[in-house]
Amino acid sequence: MNIKWLGHSAFHIETAKAKILIDPFFTGNPAFRDEERKAATAGLTHILLTHGHGDHVGDTVAIAKETGATVLANFDLCMWLGRQGISKLEPGNTGGTIQLGSFTATFVNALHSSAQITDDGVSHSLGNANGLVLHFDDEPTLYHMGDTEIFSDMALVQELHEPEIGIVPIGDRFTMGGAVAALACQRYFKFNTTIPCHYGSFPIIDQTPETFIAGMDGASTLVATPEVGGAVTL
């Protein structure tokens, strides 16, 4: 498995049988490097969305039309995407598991909002924000938390799914900050590898993972902090 960070919460995950984008926020992402786009979309099989905010939906519509990739998201967000001309959709909701060829995706809780703001300035709710747990045939189980605060039912995510890889938001203001994210990882999970995200993009969120790294001192997990465009191979 190759996991490439594309800035903010965007990741490209490649296995022997799938090429996946999670939350492909490219256009307008201060951290994204345009030269990464071609490789990130080549041969793409799936786009997975944690929630409906623009910095997570990102370029989904354009990429889905360009590649024909299947898009998985919560039901309300899928209905909105359908109105944008996307037909290969896999709608679900919290607690549901969907088979996507060589892997499954399970919607789990996240404490956050999910909406799009139209040109008139009105915010329209697009279902629940979620984390996503991905179970693969022959690869480690991965948990992308989406945008969230710490919550005690993270213990159930560990009990039910036993994720080996955790992708964790740490940037503060819109998600938990680094110290709280480290507490969540240390208290509730037994990750082999932990990858922080949702930092170093917009100036109003934390710019480095240092607080998170300090909070993970003594943990048995590997904390991987690739540069944007860098990858972790497992």
Curated annotation (Swiss-Prot):
GO molecular function terms attached to this record: hydrolase activity
Keyword Hydrolase in record: yes
InterPro entries in UniProt: Metallo-B-lactamas, RibonucZ/Hydroxyglut_hydro, UPF0173, UPF0173_UPF0282_UlaG_hydrolase
Keywords: Hydrolase
Family: Belongs to the UPF0173 family.
Entry protein name: UPF0173 metal-dependent hydrolase R01310
Organism: Rhizobium meliloti (strain 1021) (Ensifer meliloti)
